[in-house]
Swiss-Prot record:
It comes from Mycobacterium bovis (strain ATCC BAA-935 / AF2122/97). InterPro entries: Acyl_CoA_acyltransferase (IPR016181), GNAT_dom (IPR000182). Residues 8-150 form the N-acetyltransferase domain. This is UPF0039 protein Mb2876c. SUPFAM superfamilies: Acyl-CoA N-acyltransferases (Nat). GO terms for molecular function: acyltransferase activity, transferring groups other than amino-acyl groups. Belongs to the UPF0039 (ElaA) family.
Length: 156
């Protein structure tokens, strides 16, 4: 079955779609990973937030990510977060498909992600490099990573 790729600005997100995205994120991050944290962080409906997801013909969300535009120090940068895939849909390239779609939109701008440590190799395949020390977020090791924009100096 081929999932449709959806991309929607926060302001255009309908209630059903938002519910399905949040439901999947809670399934993965809160239940599966046993991290009782507030998934609703206030950023899903910000004007500069875009949501990407894959959806089956019957409307089931199988994979999602959130792309946010930030302006750190006056510089436009993007941040990818909340990338997750439904347990029974893993291993089929869905995360890579969403990452490619989001990064196509990012274009030549820098993009950041706080990657779960075991996923750093996957993000490296998309041009991300380590950009700081490993840290714990809700008990899970994470690594800050950066995909430099054009003209940016890559870090080792």
């Amino acid at each position: 079955m081929t999932e449709a790729l959806r991309r929607v600005w926060a302001k255009d997100l309908d209630a059903r779609a938002l519910y399905e995205l949040l439901k999947l994120r809670v399934e993965v991050f809160v239940v599966e990973q046993a991290c009782p944290y507030p998934e609703l962080d206030g950023r899903d409906l910000l004007a500069e937030t875009r949501h990407f997801w894959l959806e089956t013909p019957d409307g089931e969300v199988t994979c999602t990510l959130r792309l946010m535009e930030e302006h750190a120090g006056g510089e436009k940068v993007f941040r990818i977060g909340r990338l997750c895939t439904k347990r029974d849909a893993r291993g089929q390239g869905h995360s890579n498909r969403l990452l490619c779609a989001a990064l196509a939109e990012v274009g030549d701008y820098p993009c950041r992600i706080d990657a779960q440590a075991y996923l750093t190799a996957m993000y490296a395949q998309h041009g991300f490099v380590r950009d700081g020390d490993e840290f714990l977020d809700d008990g899970i090791p994470h690594v800050p990573m950066l995909r430099p924009g054009s003209g940016q100096v890559e870090r080792p």
